[in-house]
């Protein structure tokens, strides 16, 4: 193509993504758009076409990004090229959302006509506004009997501050309003700006590993053109590769001759390691590099850590390979080897949040068939030592001695909770129980309230989300963002079994709730650890001071059974002999800790009702 043709084509490109809270109909709307533009035949259509991972379809959530190229013949007779970039809606994947938004010029904001705006919608809308996108509000599910489009329209204006007077009323399920949305995309969303003759700049917004072609990078071309045979360079690492193939998605991959300004597609360049295609990085031409990379690339820092150990220690290498393979598609997953006396060899893994952690665990078990033991999740604490140095601790077993610690700081998050006003009381109680500080409260309308709290991340990591859902009968929605570190009165608690520390059960807890927490855990472990031939004390200790204890009683044979009548001294002799034996066993005996015990530590609800 010459310059004229490229520019003409560029004017007809529209790049957009769809923002919505879970279950507001985003994937269904994407299906309808695919159908309307003829990207898929009736036969190929299935629910949630873009959610390709089995897990995504099962949970009904979008985890990875997907991009599709569509052609749409508008009412003005022109044929437009649409790139729909599907984004995850969940808070753990905020970075995925922000990069997919960076690859667009516009976003469709889908809001459920019955439920109104939810916490995650807000978070993603603000990301879109930060990326200067044109936002088209769509009120979905208007076919529901409980739909109140006018109330929702008002809410969009009041809460987000968007003009929703011309919001499209639609129902993706029934197919109402889809044409109108497509026309609005043509009319409202700007064409990509960029120069096809400038040095190449392409944003990597995702990457995936293909065993035959190496890494496939998903890119959005911002300036310049890329074609096979060209040498390219990654701007954050400076590594160079030669492009072997470029193409677009029509959901399936389709090879094309070149990708130019505004195109969303993929390229392969015999890249062996996915670490070389960092998400958010800029690809440029090796011979004629761009002066500076595209903004918005940042290295992802994991927020939540946990240990993962194979139940069968022989599969340690399989686990490493599995984690490496998952890391190919998931730039946010971090892991490094660690050992534990109780669990043997395993890995310390870092995740973006709890959902991310659960999904990785599930994928390891499903796709790689590795049975895992996972330890309690923890966050990164900043520990200031008395000699003036500062260390980051993400594993409770690495916590320095209490004598050396000057103060410990922990990460705090700003939690935005949307809740029906009947449940404001229980939710505020929950947040205070989790050491939250009240920041703000706004009534969105007569039925719903937005609460803002600053809460330590470590409290959210446990079971905050479940507790929130059960306290509000599932009506609350919740979103959080990191706001920084604050000093807290924290201590490390160890669990001792038969006088030995079980390193995998150590955790860090606030001093005020240490006693209750310790008591609850030893009681729980007493029920979960199978009884041994000897008596086993279970203790919770802070430093050298034991603060809670319970005892797992010994299993014992009735040695007096064969005595019938008999002299008391004979009975006493047998009992003493049994006692001696138990004592000897206790000295050399070791206790097996079942998998449930590690999970129980996470599930303990500190607020004993």
Curated annotation (Swiss-Prot):
InterPro entries: EF-4 (IPR006297), EFG_III/V (IPR035647), EFG_V-like (IPR000640), EFTu-like_2 (IPR004161), G_TR_CS (IPR031157), LepA_C_sf (IPR038363), LepA_CTD (IPR013842), LepA_IV (IPR035654). The keyword Cell membrane applies. GTP binds at residues 23-28, 140-143. Its EC number is 3.6.5.n1. GO terms for molecular function: GTP binding; GTPase activity; ribosome binding; translation elongation factor activity. It is an enzyme of class 3 (hydrolase). SMART domains: EFG_C. Residues 11-193 form the tr-type G domain. It catalyses: GTP + H2O = GDP + phosphate + H(+). One of its GO terms (cellular component) is plasma membrane. The keyword Ribonucleoprotein does not apply. Belongs to the TRAFAC class translation factor GTPase superfamily. Classic translation factor GTPase family. LepA subfamily. Required for accurate and efficient protein synthesis under certain stress conditions. May act as a fidelity factor of the translation reaction, by catalyzing a one-codon backward translocation of tRNAs on improperly translocated ribosomes. Back-translocation proceeds from a post-translocation (POST) complex to a pre-translocation (PRE) complex, thus giving elongation factor G a second chance to translocate the tRNAs correctly. Binds to ribosomes in a GTP-dependent manner. HAMAP family: LepA. This is Elongation factor 4. It comes from Geobacillus kaustophilus (strain HTA426). The lineage of its organism: Bacteria, Bacillati, Bacillota, Bacilli, Bacillales.
């Amino acid at each position: 193509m010459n310059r004229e043709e490229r520019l003409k084509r560029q004017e007809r490109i529209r790049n957009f993504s769809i923002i919505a809270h879970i279950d507001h109909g985003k994937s269904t709307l994407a299906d309808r758009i695919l159908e309307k533009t003829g990207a898929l035949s009736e036969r190929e259509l299935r629910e949630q076409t873009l959610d390709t991972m089995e897990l995504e379809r099962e949970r009904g959530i979008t985890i990875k990004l997907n991009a599709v190229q569509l052609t749409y013949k508008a009412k003005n007779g022109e044929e437009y090229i649409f790139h729909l970039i599907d984004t995850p809606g969940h808070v753990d994947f905020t970075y995925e959302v922000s990069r997919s938004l960076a690859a667009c010029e516009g976003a469709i904001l889908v809001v459920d006509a019955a439920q109104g705006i939810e916490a995650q919608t807000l978070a993603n809308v603000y990301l879109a506004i930060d990326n200067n996108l044109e936002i088209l509000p769509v009120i979905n599910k208007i076919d529901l009997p409980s739909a109140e489009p006018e109330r929702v329209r008002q809410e969009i204006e009041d809460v987000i501050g968007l003009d929703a007077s011309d919001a499209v009323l639609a129902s993706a399920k029934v197919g109402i309003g889809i044409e109108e949305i497509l026309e609005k995309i043509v009319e409202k969303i700007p064409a990509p700006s960029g120069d096809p003759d400038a040095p190449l700049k392409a944003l990597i917004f995702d990457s995936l590993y293909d065993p035959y072609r190496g890494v496939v990078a998903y890119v959005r071309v911002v300036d310049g053109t890329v074609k096979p045979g060209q040498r390219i360079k990654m701007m954050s690492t400076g590594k160079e590769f030669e492009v072997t193939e470029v193409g677009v998605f029509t959901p399936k991959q389709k090879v094309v001759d070149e990708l130019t300004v505004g195109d969303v597609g993929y390229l392969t360049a015999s890249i062996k390691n996915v670490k070389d295609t960092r998400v958010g990085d800029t690809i440029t031409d090796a011979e004629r590099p761009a002066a500076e990379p595209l903004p918005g690339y940042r290295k992802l820092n994991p927020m939540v850590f946990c240990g993962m150990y194979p139940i069968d220690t022989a599969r340690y290498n399989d686990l490493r390979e599995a984690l490496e393979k998952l890391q190919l598609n998931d730039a946010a997953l971090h892991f490094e080897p660690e050992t534990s006396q109780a669990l043997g060899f395993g890995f310390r893994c870092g995740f973006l949040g709890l959902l991310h952690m659960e999904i990785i665990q599930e994928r390891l078990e499903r796709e790689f068939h590795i049975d895992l033991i996972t330890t309690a999740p923890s966050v990164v604490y900043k520990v200031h030592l008395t000699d003036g140095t500062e260390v980051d601790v993400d594993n409770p077993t690495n916590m320095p001695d209490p004598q050396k610690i000057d103060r410990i700081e922990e990460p705090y998050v700003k939690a935005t909770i949307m809740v029906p006003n009947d449940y404001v009381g229980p939710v505020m109680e929950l947040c205070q129980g989790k050491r939250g500080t009240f920041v703000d409260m706004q009534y969105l309308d007569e039925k719903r309230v937005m609460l803002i709290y600053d809460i330590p991340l470590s409290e959210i990591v446990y079971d905050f989300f479940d507790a929130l859902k059960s306290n509000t009968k599932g009506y609350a929605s919740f979103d959080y963002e990191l706001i920084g570190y604050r000093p807290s009165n924290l201590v490390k608690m160890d669990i001792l079994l038969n006088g030995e520390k079980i390193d995998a059960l150590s955790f860090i807890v606030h001093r005020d709730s240490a006693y209750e927490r310790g008591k609850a855990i030893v009681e729980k472990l007493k029920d979960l650890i199978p009884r041994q031939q000897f008596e086993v004390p279970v203790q919770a200790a802070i430093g050298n001071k034991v603060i809670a204890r319970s005892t797992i009683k010994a299993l014992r044979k009735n040695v007096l059974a064969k005595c019938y009548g008999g002299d008391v001294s004979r009975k006493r002799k047998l009992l003493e002999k049994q006692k001696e034996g138990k004592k000897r066993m206790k000295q050399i005996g070791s206790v097996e800790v079942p998998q449930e015990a590690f999970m129980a530590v996470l599930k303990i609800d500190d607020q004993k009702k």
